[in-house]
Amino acid sequence: PRGSPRINARRAVNLLQSLSVEEMASRREAAELAIRELGISFTVYTERGNIDRAWPFDIIPRVIPAKEWAKVSKGLTQRSRALNLFINDIYNEQKILKDGVVPAEIVLDSPNYKSQCQGVSPTHGVWAHICGTDLVRNIDGKFYVLEDNLRVPSGVSYMVENREITKRVLPELFENYSILPVDDYPSQLYQTLASLSPRDRKRPCIVVLTPGIFNSAYFEHAFLAQGMGAELVEGSDLFVDDDDCVYMRTVDGPVRVDVVYRRIDEDFMDPEAFREDSVLGVAGLMRSWKAGKVA
């Protein structure tokens, strides 16, 4: 009320108010320097060429109470399950179309509907293992979903790095709050991907498939590969052999790949199944996936 900070944000506001204008400017400069040192950037595509930009950083943190976040997290988990059930139904029994809940033409005439996936049942029945859900807080104070990105969600590395920079420039915040960690994301991602391996191995071979250094999210591709201890590869580094298995080219010879974390659009991932002119993907990747030889 009357512009006073919410209870959960009060300590953060008090800390910021205790800093002079000069101190705030100094800490902001420290944050910008850290971003440059860490090489945190993204690419802006323009008609005149591609421009690398430093990641914009807001020094003022957003404070979300644990109880509120637990509710949001529960809702997002439920939403992710519902979306996966929907996709699995679309590519198999299509009950939701037959029952008229969703008009068939909306789905089947969509350019995002891939008939090549019809009849496939992936491991755990999960199609979208990583969901990028954009949230907004409305004027009523509640969180709403703006959109779901299930195809090639991007941006999580910036979240992890934002937290690291905040620790550097506002360490006092972490003395006053009990804050949920985010730096374990790469290990959580690794566990998720490892659970999909078609082979029962203690440490399956996982690769991150990137379009290359000129992609706007290349920083993230490299960040996640390094964090998981996975190989960062381009399409030319992989091939599908006569046994329908995916192999990675190495100096010691071919190495079988168990899981491909795809960071390229599906239209470009396999010229054998999708766009024939694609030079970014791996010919036969869909065939290998359908045969259960790779995830």
Regions found by a protein language model. Give the residues of each.
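Preference for protein termini
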Residues: 1-295
